[in-house]
Amino acid sequence: SVLRQLGGKNRLENLNSAIARLGGELYADVAFQKVTQISKHYMENQETSRYYGAGYIAQFGVTNPASLRRTSALGYSENIYNLLSPKFLPYYVSGFLSSTKDYSLNGYSLRDLGNELHADKRRTELINREQALMIVESQLQAIADSGKNVMVSGGNLYALNGVKHVIDAPMTATEYVIVDETIPLYEMILHGCVDYTGQALNTIVSDDWQAKLLKMVEYGASPRYTFTAQQASDMKHMALTRLYAT
């Protein structure tokens, strides 16, 4: 159900109608595989993917600029997340589809199902990456069969079947010194097949946003921005500081 603090179902229906009158579409953004510490119904020990060693769960965070390890909270516990075991993915996907089927939504925005693939290396019921891939593909198909449009972030090849939009598509190459030239191979393959865009322009750390915009146009990507209804300053001293420019 829609949280009462967010306006409930009626306000969601009103928002969808307002966006439709402007010619837009409303997508429900959902993360199935990266479960944050603030989740109330998640059983961490049972449902989190594990390493080979007993007691080690797949828990990550944001990149620490000092150590470059992607396990830091940087002072905000909501930055920490667990990787859901592929074993439990069908359970959560089916529950989500069942609970949202009656809402007036144009589609679903899959925050991590299109760019996150991982194994579960627990000693019993081990699930390797190939098995995880089959599970993810089956759930992507189930979401596509729901009749809603599908948007994915990142857009790995296995996630593109039945997808209408791709956001956060790669617009740059690696920063390795050995790389001489950048070729937009990803965009060359997708162009004309699905709509795609890169990172929101107003959240990119850059001293030349105009060049970033022109690069998107050159690569055939739609310019993208992220906006918030309230003052962005309300997100100061929070894990959402990456959205401070919205």
Where are these regions (language model features)?
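Aromatic- and glycine-enriched glycan-recognition loops and surfaces
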Residues: S1-Q37, H41, Q131-Q141
